From Swiss-Prot:
Task of the protein: Endo-1,5-alpha-L-arabinanase involved in degradation of pectin. Its preferred substrate is linear 1,5-alpha-L-arabinan.
Main location (coarse class): secreted
Region Disordered, residue ranges: 202-227
Glycosylation sites: 194
Positions of the catalytic residues: 39 (proton acceptor), 233 (proton donor)
Any one of the GO CC terms: extracellular region
InterPro entries: GH43_arabinanases, Glyco_hydro_43, Glyco_hydro_43_endo_a_Ara-ase, Glyco_hydro_beta-prop_sf
Protein name: Probable arabinan endo-1,5-alpha-L-arabinosidase B
Family statement: Belongs to the glycosyl hydrolase 43 family.
Localization per Swiss-Prot or TrEMBL: Secreted
Pfam families to which the protein is assigned, alphabetical: Glyco_hydro_43
EC code(s) of this entry: 3.2.1.99
Length: 358
């Protein structure tokens, strides 16, 4: 028994050492949960926690607390999305908010590596399954209504998040290509307002211009970017006075081969910039604008966490909590086994830091 335990310990140490880290191993351990989920959004409503993630018709999970136990209770949509493009059965990267008693679930439909995409919205009077109405697309890129207008003619319209300031909504979205953008929502929160001129705000862009042969060779112009891959997506904006914080998922999100992982620091990680305006410009600690490739690394691979991303922030009695999906370094199985984790946030000189649990 001692020999088995020793061999297991040696195996564990060896495996964990083989997983590259972009954050120090001294980083506080993630608060792990039993929920397997990809690109989560978490809300607290009606005395319970709800998590929405990628899956058949946008799966809904419920728990008495953020730590769980979590159980799947149904889905947002009762059939495929009414948007006629992309993976209509399994919409991506949902984000759910509540405004004046109505719940809005924004979601993406697309195909991997292409920007023929759309963001849709469904509404309900309850955060749980049943009673949701799918209103279809509110913005599109690649093809479809409005896709030839700025900024949709240069973006990939996926990964929605919504910032609410007063009675106004701001749709934040984007992945690769020209990066992250923000446009105003109308009062109904189910349609987009005027996006011309200064109403469309460019928030972030990845500086990398790596060329990928498979992308260059793709005959579909909507599935290649002649300037190279720019891996930034999954944006989210939170507020902690006096700053707005733009959170980004930075680096390679998917298709991890445990025998050929990307170089350390090129896998998913969570970065942030701040601004006194909800529209930016957002800068990192060095004052570099996120549209120029800036971004402060807040949480990356460490300890048993590999490639955290798909993040959001939820505020509880003890303060702000950063939640995300991550892959487990131990017994690495890749993104298909990603689970929900969370970390407590503190603020030092106006910058968020990961801290120990209170």
């Amino acid at each position: 028994m001692v020999l088995v335990a020793t061999l297991f310990s040696l195996f564990t140490v060896s495996l964990c050492r083989s997983i590259p880290r972009s954050s120090p191993s001294s980083s506080p351990y993630t608060q792990a949960t039993d929920l397997k989920i990809h690109d989560p959004t978490v809300i607290n409503a009606n005395g319970a926690y709800y998590a929405y993630g990628v899956g058949e018709h946008i799966v809904i999970h419920q728990a008495p607390g953020l730590a769980g136990p979590w159980k799947q209770i149904g889905s947002v949509l009762d059939k495929d999305s009414i948007i006629p493009k992309g993976d209509r059965a399994k919409p991506w990267a949902p984000t759910t908010i509540e405004v004046k008693g109505t719940f809005y679930c924004y979601y993406s439909v697309s195909n991997a590596g292409c920007r023929d995409s759309a963001i849709g919205v469904a509404t309900s009077q309850s955060p749980g399954p049943g009673g949701w109405t799918d209103h279809g697309a509110i913005v599109q890129s690649g093809t479809g209504q409005g896709s030839d207008e700025h900024p949709f003619n240069e973006v990939n319209a996926i990964d929605p998040a919504v910032l609410v300031t007063g009675d106004k909504g701001h749709l934040v979205f984007g992945s690769y290509w020209s990066g992250i953008w923000q446009v105003p929502l109308n009062e109904d929160f189910s349609s987009v307002g005027n996006t011309t001129g200064l109403n469309a705000h460019h928030l972030a862009k990845h500086p990398k211009t790596e060329r990928v042969n498979s992308q260059d060779q793709n005959p579909d112009p909507l599935c290649r970017d002649s300037s190279g891959r720019r891996p930034v997506e999954g944006a989210y904006i939170s507020y902690h006075a006096p700053y707005y914080y733009l959170w980004l998922s930075w680096g390679q999100c998917c298709d991890y081969d445990p025998n050929n992982l990307p170089p350390s620091g090129e896998e998913y990680s969570i970065r942030v910039g701040r601004s006194e305006s909800p529209h930016g410009p957002f800068v990192d600690k060095q004052g570099k604008e996120l549209t120029q490739g800036g971004g402060e690394l807040i949480y990356g691979s460490n300890n048993d966490v590999y490639a955290p991303g798909g993040q959001g922030v939820i505020t509880v009695e003890t303060g702000d909590i950063l939640y995300y999906h991550y892959c487990e370094s131990l017994f690495f199985r890749g993104l298909s086994e990603a689970r929900l984790g969370y970390s407590y946030l503190g603020y030092v000189d106006g910058w968020p830091v990961i801290r120990e649990a209170p």
